[in-house]
UniProtKB/Swiss-Prot annotation:
Catalyzes the reversible transfer of the terminal phosphate group between ATP and AMP. Plays an important role in cellular energy homeostasis and in adenine nucleotide metabolism. This is Adenylate kinase. Monomer. It holds the Pfam family ADK. It catalyses: AMP + ATP = 2 ADP.
Length: 192
């Protein structure tokens, strides 16, 4: 089972990926985690990514696409995976389609979690409070200014993916305002 989770920051993609990973025993592939991993392993691609990130620039699609392609080749992905945070642009979605076709694979579902912006801001604030209360490290981008920028970037770059996948008959849209368990139940229904 190969699934892409779409939605704005704070929509619950990571939460749902965790639930689906446990249910279907397939890995949750987060581009942030994959980038950190190749940098830590000091792979050739990791060295390039580290140099780019160190300069303050965004890692280009060509490198992100390669990291995703390499990760999909790993043994734990043989029965599928859940992508979270990729693709972020139509260009990346087209690249993913080519990557999968070259491996004789296809996506089984693209699921978009829709949540209104006021609720997203409330969720971000609650996540910060819960993290602080638990003595954890707050994400650098979990502050009102950075979060607002992430929402703008999502609207401009990532939201066109809805149309891209809808035109291909692959998009399933879920109201992310309902409870976590109910969202999970609906996703499982789509995947069965």
């Amino acid at each position: 089972m190969r699934v892409v989770l779409l939605g704005p920051p704070g929509a619950g993609k990571g939460t749902q990926a965790k639930m689906l990973t446990e249910e279907y025993n397939i890995p949750h592939l987060s581009t942030g985690d994959m980038l950190r991993e190749v940098i830590a392993k000091e792979t050739e691609v990791g060295k390039k990514a580290k140099a780019i990130i160190s300069s303050g620039a965004l890692v280009p699609d060509s490198i992100v696409n390669q990291i995703v392609s390499d990760r999909i080749d790993e043994a734990d992905c043989i029965n599928g995976f859940i992508l979270d945070g990729y693709p972020r642009t139509v260009g990346q979605a087209e690249a993913l389609q080519q990557i999968l076709e070259s491996k004789n694979m296809r996506l089984d579902a693209v699921i978009e979690l829709c949540v209104n912006e006021d609720a997203l801001i409330e969720r971000m604030e609650r996540r910060v409070q819960e993290t602080v209360a638990a003595g954890g490290q707050v994400r650098l981008d979990d502050n009102p200014v950075a979060f607002a920028k992430r929402l703008v970037e999502y609207r401009e770059k990532t939201s066109p993916l809805s149309k891209f996948y809808s035109e291909r008959g692959m998009l399933k849209v879920i109201d992310g305002m309902i409870g976590i368990a109910e969202v999970t139940r609906i996703i499982k229904g789509f995947l069965s």
